Regions:
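Domain-level signature for soluble enzymes in the chorismate/prephenate branch of the shikimate pathway
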Residues: 35-238
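TRNA-recognition modules of translation machinery and tRNA-sensing kinases, especially anticodon-binding
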Residues: 1-34
Length: 238
């Protein structure tokens, strides 16, 4: 009766092609224990990434193909042991935090807003601007009610107003933040200000500056420990 239709069954299968694939040696750049490991660098697409790459290239970490002309998302220099990932600026800290990249270059605004658990190694001084509270020129804060704040930097705005004990209602927007107080959607905005030209053209003004912004070198915590020599060598050349 052990072999009747109602009996339980146990079986297994071997996929020889899969076993062969898994047992094959890794390409040289992926092998562990080699003399020089890859240093994976996340660069933001756009002007900031171009400037950062220029600094790295000048320090001897230029990619083997034209960085400005390639459409590839990964470029590398095997001789220098570096590999560049080109990602959205808002994703740099995510790649670094989770170990897909060892280091990255990211704006302080994005880094603070994301709350990524990474090491901040160096202020590059690139992309300088300010995180500000801005509003109408004649704005007077009515402390008897919650302040309506429009911003895309929700965590930064909340932390700032918590630090001064001010109740707020946050209105999350993704663009054209300056429009919110003009249309009465918010009392003020929290946003990055570089020159202030857009504010002036819309009859708004900076009411408070509370965070300097610039591009920072960040590192994955495990990578900082296990690739310390490579990281410090790169930073010392910058």
């Amino acid at each position: 009766q052990r072999f009747t239709p109602g009996a339980c069954a146990l079986g297994f299968a071997l996929y020889l092609d899969e076993l062969e694939r898994l047992s094959a040696p890794l390409p040289p750049v992926q092998q562990q224990g080699t003399e020089r490991q890859w240093l994976n660098i996340a660069l933001p697409k756009g002007r900031l990434g171009d400037k950062a790459y220029g600094l790295l290239a000048a320090a001897g970490y230029e990619a083997n193909e034209n960085y400005n002309e390639t459409r590839k998302l990964v470029v590398e220099n095997p001789e220098a042991g570096v590999r560049y990932f080109l990602v959205k600026p808002s994703d740099v800290a995510i790649y670094v935090e989770h170990g897909a990249a060892d280091i990255g270059i990211v704006g302080k605004d994005i880094l603070t807003e994301s709350g990524a658990d990474v090491y901040e190694l160096l202020d590059t001084g690139m992309g300088k601007c300010r995180m500000c509270v801005a509003g109408p020129r004649n704005f007077v804060d009515d402390e008897s009610r919650a302040l309506r704040v429009a911003t895309k930097f929700v965590n930064i705005a909340r932390a700032h107003y918590e630090s001064i004990g001010r109740d707020i209602d946050i209105i999350k927007l993704n663009g054209s933040i300056e429009l919110a107080p003009i249309l009465g959607l918010s009392d003020v905005i929290v946003d990055i200000v570089e020159t202030g030209t857009t504010l002036k053209e819309n009859n708004l003004t900076v009411l408070e500056e509370f965070m300097p912004i610039s591009a920072r070198f960040i590192a994955n915590k495990a990578s900082y420990k296990f690739k310390y020599a490579q990281l410090t060598e790169l930073l010392n050349k910058m």
